[in-house]
């Protein structure tokens, strides 16, 4: 399918029931990759892409080839060990309207925010409505969740001698009742809370 090279592998691995006869009309992918830096910060690179597998005419962009990106937003968050965003880089390689990229400087308003309770509300206070971009907000929500995994993964990843020891930056108690596996009294929480 045209444009699929921009997305993660979409062909294999599906365990869903066989679908009814259908044809693809849009693919949205949100991909995050996390990296541990030598200075102890964690970088989360995020990419949001929408493509259509057919050629179409846009009232604002003219002819759009099959597989071309309607939306393509990229962000990098640099987060310290206390979960504070230290830096943000942004790019908008493809937008549906010429003026979309005018809000790019506004994304710097997330620098200094802490990823944790209240993060989504703080994002919307700074970047909601005409101050931001719906798609960038969606990407930031996913990147915040990716940051949680990045900090957890950093506890298991091999370290070079120059890198600091990982610290647990998430209180296990904050996970209680956030999903079925973390339910109060469940086996997973009992085992996690019993660890020193």
Question: Where are the model-predicted features located?
Answer:
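Compositionally biased, low-complexity repeat tracts
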Residues: 8-9, 42, 181-182
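Charged, compositionally biased non-catalytic regions
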Residues: 1-13
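N-terminal intrinsically disordered, cationic/polar leader segments
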Residues: 17-44, 49-58, 70-72
């Amino acid at each position: 399918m045209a444009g699929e090279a921009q997305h993660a592998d979409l062909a294999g691995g599906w365990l869903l029931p066989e679908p009814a006869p259908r044809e693809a009309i849009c693919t949205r992918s949100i991909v995050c990759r996390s990296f541990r830096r030598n200075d102890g910060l964690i970088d989360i690179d995020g990419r949001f892409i929408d493509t259509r597998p057919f050629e179409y005419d846009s009232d604002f962009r003219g002819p759009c080839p099959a597989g071309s990106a309607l939306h393509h937003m990229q962000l990098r968050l640099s987060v310290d060990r206390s979960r504070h965003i230290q830096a943000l880089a942004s790019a908008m390689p493809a937008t549906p309207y010429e003026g979309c990229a005018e809000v790019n400087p506004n994304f710097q308003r997330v620098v200094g925010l802490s990823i944790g309770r209240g993060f989504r509300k703080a994002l919307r206070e700074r970047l909601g409505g005409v101050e931001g971009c719906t798609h960038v907000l969606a990407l930031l929500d996913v990147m915040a969740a990716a940051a949680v995994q990045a900090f957890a993964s950093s506890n298991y990843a091999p370290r070079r001698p120059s890198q600091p020891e990982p610290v647990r930056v998430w209180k296990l108690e904050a996970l209680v009742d956030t999903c079925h596996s973390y339910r109060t009294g469940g086996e997973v929480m009992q085992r996690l809370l019993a660890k020193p």
